[in-house]
Amino acid sequence: MARTNESSPYVEFDRKQWRTLRKSTPLVLTEDELYGLRGLGEQIDLEEVAEVYLPLARLIHLQVAARQRLFAATATFLGEKHPDRQVPFVIGVAGSVAVGKSTTARVLQALLARWDHHPRVDLVTTDGFLYPTRELQRRGIMHRKGFPESYDRRKLLRFVTEVKSGAEEVAAPVYSHTSYDIIPGQYHLIRQPDILIIEGLNVLQTGPRLMVSDLFDFSIYVDARIEDIEAWYIQRFLALRNTSFADPNAHFHHYSGLSDRDATIAAKEIWNSINHPNLVENILPTRPRATLVLRKDADHTINRLRLRKL
């Protein structure tokens, strides 16, 4: 049985308990497909997909159906002509740099798109809503890139609002990790999806005004010990020397020739000055707002989950 406390808004599961909630949901991903979804350094395998992500996909599928019935009931009450109009179900995925939230979002997108009732599932990262480098420099916050103030939060809120309101086409800016900047004139076009997944560091933040998190129907926080996340970040940084950083046009190309020792020192400096403060000050405090917390162990495997019941 899952652990529950009548005074707590959460139900806690270990992986063995959670996997039973898959029921008869079929495994629809192949190893080759999973390879294409797996992020650098991630260890996710088909067993984890079956035991963690399939129950999650089933839960979200049930919630999508329930939410559509609720919207239809409200539309009928208001006397709208098309009470069966589908309203996009919006999912937020949050967590630290290097914790694996991008892989979580991609795997979830692939699984949810296999359901007949919601085949159109779009994924947008909040990187595209960072201010361009020139604007960050103008504001004197280039060193705060990734912190809440480095994002055009009004633009992100307007984007999600338009998608959820049923706009035929909404454009999301595209970010390049090679140039470390927004790509001028390039957009990811979102055309009335059944489900929209928004993935980013600070998507669960709250504030005195309407925030993008207020528009989420379901939210996930990918969690791990801070010491483990730091180790993963350093490992990823070292690996990037031979991949993204090796591109002569890459913003971080100057790191590609560093020795293991010097690259580790550089990664730790970035972690200590940017990623760790952002995690502790801004990202981690939003964890209690998540509908579901996925807790990873040091080997990247998800073995504990916490589901909000209220």
From Swiss-Prot:
It is an enzyme of class 2 (transferase). Its EC number is 2.7.1.33. GO terms for biological process: coenzyme A biosynthetic process. It is found in: Cytoplasm. Keywords: ATP-binding, Coenzyme A biosynthesis, Cytoplasm, Kinase, Nucleotide-binding, Transferase. It catalyses: (R)-pantothenate + ATP = (R)-4'-phosphopantothenate + ADP + H(+). One of its GO terms (molecular function) is pantothenate kinase activity. InterPro entries: P-loop_NTPase, PanK, PRK/URK. One of its GO terms (cellular component) is cytoplasm. ATP binds at G95, S96, V97, A98, V99, G100, K101, S102. Pathway: Cofactor biosynthesis; coenzyme A biosynthesis; CoA from (R)-pantothenate: step 1/5. Pfam families: PRK. Transmembrane segments: none annotated. HAMAP family: Pantothen_kinase_1. Belongs to the prokaryotic pantothenate kinase family. This is Pantothenate kinase. It comes from Rhodococcus erythropolis (strain PR4 / NBRC 100887). The gene is coaA.
